[in-house]
């Protein structure tokens, strides 16, 4: 079975900046995607957030562009629509941006897991789309 996962912005940042305790698992996820062993989805707004945040770390523009190009080689971008924003704004999520990411993933067809490093921000997520950290996903994948 080829898993379809939706990655939150922070998973990309953890991998790129080698930050947090699970950046190696994030790296493993993107290696699987590069090898076509899993399918990765993310939102267009997530990529924009990533580019902006990378700029605040003073990462050279050329490196940002190269990373963006690499992401697009193994990630399918999904655009949130009006319904996604309406659901996010009326949801119990504390952070609207997190809600937009989650409801964008729900809108997509057949996403198996939502992957985020900030799992505590997704406690109000529905049970129809499980939320995993990169480590939890890799444990599930390797079963």
Q: What are these model-predicted stretches?
A:
Residues 1-4, 74, 106-143:
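Acidic, PIN/NYN-like endoribonuclease modules and their adjacent C-terminal/linker elements
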Residues 1-42, 56-62, 132, 137-143:
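Short, well-structured N-terminal submotif of metal-dependent ribonuclease cores
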Residues 8, 98, 118:
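Acidic active-site catalytic centers that drive phospho-/nucleotidyl reactions
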Residues 12, 48-50, 121-123:
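Short, active-site-adjacent cap segments at secondary-structure transitions
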Residues 12, 18, 99-102, 125:
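A generic signature of intrinsically disordered, low-complexity regions enriched in glycine/proline
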